[in-house]
Amino acid sequence: KLDLAKNRMYCNYAFYFGATADNSIDLASLNNLDGCCGIKLFAGSSTGNLLVAEEEDIDKVFQNSSKVVAVHSEDESILNLNKKLIKKGDVNSHPIWRSVECAISSTRRIVKIAERYNKKAHILHITTKEEIDFLSQHKGNITFEITPQHLTLFAPDCYLKLGTYAQMNPPIRDKTHYDRLWYAVRNNFNDTIGSDHAPHLKINKDKEYPASPSGMPGVQTLMPVMLNHVNDGKLSLSQLIKFVCENPVKIFGIKNKGFIKEVLMLTLQLLI
C-alpha cells in the first residue's frame, strides 16, 4: 500500500493493518511498522472481505493489539438475522436491515472487551443516539468518530432524494439520531470527525438495491461540508480543528503534527 501511495498522494497518509480471525498474533508487533497508524477491525461485514465476527476472535485482536483498534461496529449475527427485512429495490429498508440494535449491540461488546484488556478502541462512524449515550459514559481508552454525511443527511429524506447514493454502512438514520449526533458534537462527546471515504463508480451505485454498493466519497468533501456547518453556527471553528487535527494525532500517536507550535512540523490547509 505504501508503494502504491508513493508519488500519488499529496498529503500525509498512513494505513490500518487489517485484523482477521487468523492474524491476531501479528498484531502484537506493529509499533515499529512504518506507515501503520492502527488496526482496523470489521465486527460486521461491509465493503471488502475483512470480518472478525466471533467474540472469541475479537477478544484475541484486543488482547494482542499493540496499537489503537479502529472498529467498524455492527453485529454480524443481527445483520444475518435481519437479511429477511431487505426489500429489493427499496433502499429505505437499508437502516431497517442494519438496525439500531445491530449497532449498539456491537459497540457494547467492543467496549467491554477493550476495557477488559485496558486497550484503546476507536469506534468509527457512530450513527445512533443509543451509542452516543453509551459511549459518553465510557471515555478514557474509548474514543469515537462521527462522519459529515451522518451530520448532513437524515432518513427518509436522504433516500427519497438520493436513493442508493445515500446508501452506506452503518446507514443514515432518522432525525432523532441525527439530532443526537449534533447534540454530541455541540457537547464535544465525540473525539473526531472522519470521512469514511468509500467512493464507487456511478454504474455500480446505480444498481438496484441491495446490489448497489455502500459508501460515498469523503476525503475531499469533509472540510467543505463541515465548514458549511461552522458557517451555519452548528459548531465552532475551534471545535472543528480539534475534531480533525488535534484529537486524531493524540488518538493515533502521530508525532509532530496536528498543532501550530514552534517545535512541530507545520501542515496547513488553505481555505479559499
State the predicted function of each range.
Residues 1-11, 58-71, 220-225:
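Alpha-helix-loop-beta-strand connector modules within alpha/beta enzyme cores
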Residues 4-25, 42-47:
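Metal-cofactor-binding active-site regions of metalloenzymes
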